[in-house]
Amino acid sequence: MALNKYLDVAPEVAQAVAGGKPVVALESTIISHGMPYPQNVETALQVEQIIRDNGAVPATIAILGGRLKAGCTKEEIEYLGKQGQAVTKASRRDLAVLCARGADGATTVTTTMMIAHMAGIKIFATGGIGGVHRGAETTMDISADLEELANTPVMVVCAGAKSILDLGLTLEYLETHGVPVLGYGTKELPAFYTRKSGFEVDYQVDTPAELAAIFHASHELGLKGGMLVTNPIPEEFSMDHEVINRAIDEAIAAANAQGIHGKATTPFLLAKVKELTGGDSLDSNIQLVFNNARLAAQTACELSKL
């Protein structure tokens, strides 16, 4: 497989991977579709700095000019931030088209996992994963993120599944595909903006060292899939359960009324929830990404010792 034909690994990232040093992958959809410019660029650079401060090398992943980038420069992050939603939100089905056309794409959880794995990066920090959408029993709207977690051996550190989803069905899907769902310091699945969901994770894990040991064992056992680490949003940034659920219900009703579906759904719902919560949800979103970056870097450092 002539991967290097399309893959560009940043020198710092390549050096770290080759030397067994800790590296953390980051997605780029959060830059293009997750928040407005210039806040998106500032946040992305802050996340990279948090990873450095915790001893690891950050690798922001994107598709630029048909090249799969494992590690972006500040200029490339700035470019993605300015382009915003004009950049294609790229899932697995888009990769070949974007590469063949020499086009740009912002990576979702799915494509970030794929490109991280190609580049030899084992850990990836994000905000929240996609999952089974509410009403999926009639729409079949299930995020490709879940399929990637079933097939690609990368640890994904997130704040749970986005609470706009059907969390029960999302957990069922992950169980069917053999993906372990670990709760960092919690038995309860966090729901992105809030620390509670009413659903249990498979196992509570309390230290980065144990997270690393579990991932290492999975690798040694030759298990093909990924692993989901759910890290609750810090208490002080957590939103009121009732407030956020009310906003989500309203946002879903608006999406249905406007006939919004497919990959436009999540950006629409997140923007609507932000509007309904007076921007509080965006602040929470930024803080939980910082928190996940910290844990991912600490876990990557522990993994590099094994």
Predicted ranges, named:
Residues 1-53, 118:
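N-terminal glycine-/serine-/threonine-rich phosphate-binding loop
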Residues 15-18, 23-24, 53, 115-118, ...:
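Solvent-exposed alpha-helices and their adjacent loops that cap or buttress functional pockets
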Residues 24-26, 58-63, 105, 123-128, ...:
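General beta-strand structural signal in soluble alpha/beta enzymes
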Residues 28, 33-35, 41-98, 220-236:
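Glycine-rich nucleotide/cofactor/substrate-binding loop typically near the N-terminus or early
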Residues 73-153:
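Divalent-metal (Mg2+/Mn2+/Ca2+)-assisted nucleotide/phosphate chemistry catalytic cores
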Residues 108-109, 137-150, 154-175, 209-213:
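Active-site glycine-rich loop that binds ribose-phosphate moieties when present
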Residues 195-220:
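Anionic-ligand binding region
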Residues 223-291:
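A C-terminal functional module that forms or caps the active site or interfaces directly
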